[in-house]
């Protein structure tokens, strides 16, 4: 068997998350079904398991295929089976594990105060976000190693809630005809819905609805103030570092 590394982009609006679903509407379902039609039966491992509605610019996968499949041949037959909502950007033969070998994962979140068209609603979140300076003041609180037990969706199981945030910041950009604030958060890994809870917390602070002290108490597992994540629209798994 050969091990392949695939880099894909997908539109999360058409899936119920990356992981396999009972109704077969996960990204993993679509890819494994496509491979099955080619006679390839393999579990497809992803660098990050995105939630329902979350997109990916550069999700990385690993899977195995029989030796008679080379890169060019597999790309030729697989890419059309994934289109249009999944794009196979790159395929290479590489002996690695997409999840366990990943060192960092970067997420981006796009938020605008005024969405001009409903057709972009799944791709740019809409809502007030207050001040850029206040957003960055809040984001700084999350850098470093922390126990993120109070920054994960209830029911999200994990054996180790400790994660490292290497960098977290926000900036403004003009994207798809909209003035947006762009959040970028880079960490070693993330708990379920953790990125969205972090961003929601920062937005609520920027809108002066919570204090830095309350953020610190939640980071230190003293008291949870924000338990509802921000909407999934506008969140992208942007890059995986190896």
From Swiss-Prot:
Entry superkingdom: Bacteria
Catalytic activity, reaction form: uridine(38/39/40) in tRNA = pseudouridine(38/39/40) in tRNA
Family matches, as CDD domains: PseudoU_synth_EcTruA
EC number: 5.4.99.12
GO biological process, one term: tRNA pseudouridine synthesis
Enzyme class: isomerase
Single GO molecular function: RNA binding
InterPro entries registered for this protein in UniProt: PsdUridine_synth_cat_dom_sf, PsdUridine_synth_TruA, PsdUridine_synth_TruA_a/b_dom, PsdUridine_synth_TruA_C, TruA/RsuA/RluB/E/F_N
Disulfide bond annotation, renumbered to this chain: none
Active site (record annotation): 51
Swiss-Prot/TrEMBL keywords: Isomerase, tRNA processing
Residues annotated for substrate binding in this entry: 107
Record note on quaternary structure: Homodimer.
Family under the similarity heading: Belongs to the tRNA pseudouridine synthase TruA family.
Physiological role: Formation of pseudouridine at positions 38, 39 and 40 in the anticodon stem and loop of transfer RNAs.
UniProt name for this protein: tRNA pseudouridine synthase A
Gene: truA
